[in-house]
UniProtKB/Swiss-Prot annotation:
Its EC number is 7.1.1.-. It comes from Sodalis glossinidius (strain morsitans). NDH-1 is composed of 13 different subunits. Subunits NuoA, H, J, K, L, M, N constitute the membrane sector of the complex. This is NADH-quinone oxidoreductase subunit H. NDH-1 shuttles electrons from NADH, via FMN and iron-sulfur (Fe-S) centers, to quinones in the respiratory chain. The immediate electron acceptor for the enzyme in this species is believed to be ubiquinone. Couples the redox reaction to proton translocation (for every two electrons transferred, four hydrogen ions are translocated across the cytoplasmic membrane), and thus conserves the redox energy in a proton gradient. This subunit may bind ubiquinone. Its main location: membrane. It is an enzyme of class 7 (translocase). Belongs to the complex I subunit 1 family. One of its GO terms (biological process) is aerobic respiration. The gene is nuoH.
Length: 325
């Protein structure tokens, strides 16, 4: 078969990797919603979903079927085009980011030299999904939720980017694979501890997860910017939130905890174990912490996260200059 040139084989391998990663990430994100409900029940001394299938294992399938058969209703006062576009952006923005995450030394869909910048770009794109949803719904609660989400996300993306600059400076590259390889002897969480703390806080805020879920606070805004959504459009928002958790957890592992590196076990297994640990931490945070006021969330960012990131950058620069001489 003369058409099977090395270039065609590379393209086919990339497509296969992309499809596998897409299926794995979406499946993990979907089943994380089931795991969260079961674990929250355990933490709160009650039963979670346990009726559909063995131990509730088919609850996710029941939820998907329910969403598929619900009416895909668009309010007559909404802007139809933007209203439909918003959940698609919310679902795909952080999902595409997973393409640059190296799962193992040989398994990465897109090995960009600007991987860190690509992640920041896609995280910034997620803001538009919230803004479009809140504005196009033509609902005051949706708009208030979108305004909260935009201010919160844009603020915490500043700290998200600054927290990564120390890692980039220490590794000497924006490439995520090179950053993982630079942690062969010492994980970045040790010299970049302040950067990790800030990245973790900003990552939770970008995902709009508890305790940074003020944009969709049920008691104040009646579910915020996706109050008018139903059916599969709401399902895209719902699954997109958990896909974002999977992506942020994978990036924490890649940037601060050595990525695929570890003894004895295959690289993919190490990467999966570390990522699953941080996914469980998202659930534990939701179970353990209360929701603060919106002004307290913004104060945490500008009064604590910003000084921490600047201190981390100064310390990293001092260490690099000292080692250079």
């Amino acid at each position: 078969m003369s058409w099977l040139t090395p270039e065609v084989i590379d393209i086919l391998l990339t497509v296969v990797k992309a499809v596998v990663i897409l299926l794995v990430v979406v499946t993990c994100g979907a089943y994380m919603s089931f795991a969260e409900r079961r674990l929250l029940g355990l933490f709160q001394n009650r039963y979670g979903p346990n009726r559909v299938g063995w131990g509730g294992s088919l609850q996710l399938l029941a939820d998907v079927l329910k969403m598929m058969f619900k009416e895909d209703w668009i309010p007559p006062f909404a802007d139809r085009g933007i209203f439909t576009l918003a959940p698609v952006i919310a679902f795909t923005s952080l999902l595409i980011t997973f393409a640059i995450v190296p799962v193992s030394p040989t398994w990465v869909v897109a090995d960009f030299n600007i991987g860190v910048l690509f992640f920041l770009m896609m995280a910034g794109l997620a803001v538009y999904a919230v803004l479009f949803a809140g504005w196009s719904s033509n609902n005051k609660y949706s708009l208030l939720g979108a305004m909260r989400a935009s201010a919160q996300t844009l603020s915490y993306e500043v700290f998200l980017g600054l927290s990564l600059m120390g890692v980039v400076a220490q590794a000497g590259s924006f490439n995520l694979g090179a950053i993982v390889e630079s942690q062969a002897h010492l994980w970045n969480v040790v010299p970049q501890f302040f950067g990790f703390v800030t990245f973790a806080l900003a990552g939770v805020a970008v995902c709009h997860r508890h305790p940074f879920d003020q944009p969709e606070a049920e008691q104040e805004l009646a579910d915020g910017y996706h109050i008018e959504y139903s059916g599969m459009k709401f399902g895209l928002f719902f699954v997109g939130e958990y896909v974002g958790i999977v992506t942020i957890s994978a990036l924490m592992v890649t940037l601060f905890f050595g990525g695929w590196q570890g003894p004895w076990l295959p690289p993919f297994i190490w990467f999966s174990i570390k990522t699953a640990f941080f996914m469980m931490m998202f659930i534990l945070i939701r179970a353990a912490l209360p929701r603060p006021r919106y002004d307290q969330v913004m104060a945490l960012g500008w009064k604590i996260c910003l000084p921490l990131t600047l201190l981390n950058l100064l310390a990293t620069a001092a260490v690099i200059l000292y080692n250079a001489h």
